Amino acid sequence: RPVAAAGMPPIGQGEPPLSFFEFWPAWLFYTPVWIWIVLLMLWHRSIRLPLLANPTLPAGGLVGEEKSRLFARLGSTGSGCLPEWILVSPSDEPADVARSLEDAGLAFPLVAKPDIGCRGAGVWPIRNGEELVRYRSEFPDSCNFILQRMVDVEGEAGVFFVRAPGECRGTIVSLTLKYFPHVVGNGTATLRELI
């Protein structure tokens, strides 16, 4: 019987997921979306129509939004729900980064992630200073990245929240619980046998 990760709800036996689309390849998932966007642009005779998806974000939040700006917009109330973080720019000296980490109360292990990115690309666990130096050396010279306290729990929840302009309350339209599979070996059996 599958066992849920600590802090996550129990895994249902034989219950199909409500949606499996999140795990499709990006090109397959987004192709119909882009076709629909193009059709709407033609129908409404506006190439800028997609930018209205979220008018408070650059490009409507479709691409290129900076995580650091989104984090900062949460204010003092919302930021308490986030793991502590700092923004690192390419011009920051290692001593300045170390000082910023100390000022923010951060210590290894950390998570490094691009300030602009999606779907986990460029996200690395950083366990020590050497790994941070390596991450920085392999990161594009012109891009900022975020160092954030590592949340050491199994599983992850993805929440899709929608609030229409002018409304005080929004709605959660999608909730995805992700469990990361793992296998404990016995020293002799193959992976296939263990599964």
Explain the meaning of each model-derived region.
Residues 1-80, 87-96:
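ATP-binding N-terminal substructure of ATP-dependent carboxylate-amine bond-forming enzymes
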Residues 55-56, 66-195:
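Active-site nucleotide/adenylate-binding loops and adjacent lid/helix of ATP-dependent enzymes
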